[in-house]
Amino acid sequence: MPRRRLLKLLFIGKLRVSCKHYSTAGDPTKLVNLSEFTPDKIRNFGIVAHVDHGKSTLADRLLEMCGAVPPGQKQMLDKLQVERERGITVKAQTAALRHRGYLLNLIDTPGHVDFSAEVSRSLAVCDGILLLVAANQGVQAQTIANFWLAFEKNIQIIPVINKIDLPGADIKSVETQLKNLFEFNPEECLHISAKSGLNVDKVLEAIIDRVPAPTAIIDAPFRSMIFDSYFDHFRGAIAHIMVKEGSVKKGDKIQSYQNEKVYDVSEVGVMRPEMVKCTELRAGQVGYLVCNMRTVNEAVVGETLFAETTSRDSVKTFAEIKGVKPTVYAGLFPVETSDYESLKQAVERLCLNDPSVTVIPDSSKALGLGWRIGFLGVLHMEVFGARLSQEYDASVILCQPSVEYRAKIKDNETIRKKRYDGMEEIRILDPSKFPDESDVDSFLEPMVKVRMIVPNEMMGTVNGLCSECRGERGEITSIDSTRLVILWRLPLAEVAVDFFERLKKLTSGYASFDYEPDGWQDTRLVKLTILINSKEVSEFSQIIPAAMARDRAKILVQRLKREIPRQQFEVTIKACIGSSTKALSQIVIQPMKRDFSQLLKGNFGGGGMERLNKKLSHQKKGKERMKMVGNVQIPKEAFLNVLKR
C-alpha cells in the first residue's frame, strides 16, 4: 500500500477514535426522541463538592464520555461570563446524557457557601449525588454542609475521591475522614482523576447501579415542577422542569397552579448541554419548556404546571423547594437616574434566574430611586452586580452591605401602640428606619453557627480571630491526625462581609468554613451618622454594633476626605453616634486660598506687608460667611467609592 494512502488511513482512524463519543444531537434542526427512556431507565443525579475540588472538570469528562461534547472542551456547564472569569460555579446547570441504554440527567451545582440555595434547589430533582472530595485537600466545610443537605432529603450519596494522580494526594487519609465523618466504608469510595479521565467510567457505572430510578407515573395527566428558570428576550421565560407524571409536547395546553393561566406549549427539549428540541418530555425526565410566559412572575421556582384538562382542585402541588432567607442587604441604584426603568426590568429578569434574591424599593436624596436587595452573602452580591453589568449592560452603584437587625419596642401606650402600630418587634434593614433609643427595650442581632476545618497547628490563630469577632467557642473535633473541625457561634455582621478573606489570609488558604443561622442575640446597636459642616448626609449613615463604631467611623471619614474636592471654604467631616454632635472621628479639608503675595510682586516694603495681611483677613472673613451659607459639593463618584466595601 502506498505510504501516502497508509498515512491517510491512519489519520482517519485516529480522527474516528477521538470523535467516537461525540454526538450530533446538538443540531437544532433535529428532534431528539426520548420515548425509549421509561422511568426505570432514567437516573437523575447531581455533583456536589467544596470549591476547587474538580466538580466542573468531572462534569466535562462525563459530557465527553457520553458523547454530548467533543473532547478537550472546558467548563462546558459554566456558561456565565462571571463563572469563567472567577473560575467558580454560580448557577446550577443540567445536561441529558446517554450511556448504556440509560438517560442520565446531570445537575451541576455551585460549591461556594453563598450559593447553597442553588444546591438545595438542585437536590429537589435529584435521586442521587456524587459527593466529590479532592485527594490533596480532603473533606472541607462545604463538603460537610452538602452531605447533610442530601442526607436530610434521603438522597443516595456516592463518595468520589478526585485528583488521585496529584503528588500531594493522600487517598487513605481522605477515606479515613469520610469514614469518621459520614460512616462511608473505603470500598464504597470511587478513586478517580477527572482531569485525565482515569476511572471516570466507573462513576458512570456507579450512577446506573447505585442511584435509584425516579418516582414517576407515565399513564397519568401531565404534572411537573419548575426548579429553575430564566428570561429570554425573544421567547420570554424559559422554565426548567422535572416531569413527575404524564408527558408534554409542542401544541399541548398547560396551566399554572399559582396564577391559574393557560399556556400553549411552543417547544420542549433537553440540555446537552445546550438546548436541544425533543418530541416530548415524559415522566421522570428533566428538560426545558417554552410556552410564551411574558412576565417574570409566571415562571416562579417551585411552581406546578399541569394539563389544562385536569381540575385545579385535584392537583397535588410540590413543596420540595423552600425559600431562602437573605443574610446581607445592600442598596442598589442606577449610576444615571434616567436609567431607573431599564435597570428595574433587568433586576426583575435576573431575579427570575436567581430567586434567592429579595428586592425592596428604596430611595435616596443623592442617588435617586433604587432598591434594597437581600443576598445570601457578599460573593453572591458581587456576582449579582457583575451579571447586571455583563448580561444587561447596566451601570449600578452597590452600597456597603449590612445585615438585618431587630428591635424590641417598649410596651407603652404612646410608644408601641401609636408610633409602631402595636408591633412588639420591628425589623431594621437600613439607617432611615432606626428607632429612637428611648423607644427600645433591646436590640437583637442575627447569629450564625460557623463550622471551620483547620490544620492542627493553626487552631490558636483561628480561635484568636473568632474571639476578636465577638464569638462564643463551641466543640472541637478531630477528623484525622492533621486537621480539626472547630465550631464557633458568631454574629452574622462579623461573618458576612470579610470573615472568609481574613480566615484565608491567616491560615494561608488552608482553612475552609461554612455557616448556618443560629437565632438572635441581644446586642447594643448604634446609628453612625456622618455630618459635613454640621449637616447630616443620610446616605452615609450606617447601623453597626457599638463595639465596631469607632473603627468604622475612622474608615468613613478618611474615605470622604479622599473623595470630596477642596472647596472655597473649610469643610469639616464628623462621624457621630445618632443625633449627638460629639465626634468619634473628625477631619478638616482646608479651603483653597488665593496667593496675594504674587499680586504684590514681593513688594512688602512701604506698607506692603500690612496690605497683604489686610487682604488675608478679608479673605478669611469671606470664607467664614461662605461656610455658613454654602453647600458642600459632593460628586456622585464619592457616594460610589465611600459606600462600597
Curated annotation (Swiss-Prot):
SUPFAM superfamilies: EF-G C-terminal domain-like, P-loop containing nucleoside triphosphate hydrolases, Translation proteins
Domain tr-type G stretches: 40-215
Keyword vocabulary terms for this entry: GTP-binding, Hydrolase, Membrane, Mitochondrion, Mitochondrion inner membrane, Nucleotide-binding, Protein biosynthesis
E.C. no: 3.6.5.-
Annotated positions binding GTP: 49-56, 108-112, 162-165
UniProt GO cellular component terms: mitochondrial inner membrane; mitochondrial matrix; mitochondrion
GO MF, one example: mitochondrial ribosome binding
Record-linked Gene3D superfamilies: 3.30.70.240, Elongation factor 4, C-terminal domain (3.30.70.2570), Elongation Factor G (Translational Gtpase), domain 3 (3.30.70.870), P-loop containing nucleotide triphosphate hydrolases (3.40.50.300), Translation factors (2.40.30.10)
Main EC class the enzyme belongs to: hydrolase
Keyword flag Disulfide bond: no
Compartments where found: Mitochondrion inner membrane
Annotated signal sequence range: none
GO biological process, one term: positive regulation of translation
HAMAP family, alphabetized: LepA
Miscellaneous field: This protein may be expected to contain an N-terminal transit peptide but none has been predicted.
Function, as annotated: Promotes mitochondrial protein synthesis. May act as a fidelity factor of the translation reaction, by catalyzing a one-codon backward translocation of tRNAs on improperly translocated ribosomes. Binds to mitochondrial ribosomes in a GTP-dependent manner.
PANTHER family: TRANSLATION FACTOR GUF1, MITOCHONDRIAL, TRANSLATION FACTOR GUF1-RELATED
Protein name: Translation factor GUF1 homolog, mitochondrial
Source organism of the structure: Caenorhabditis elegans
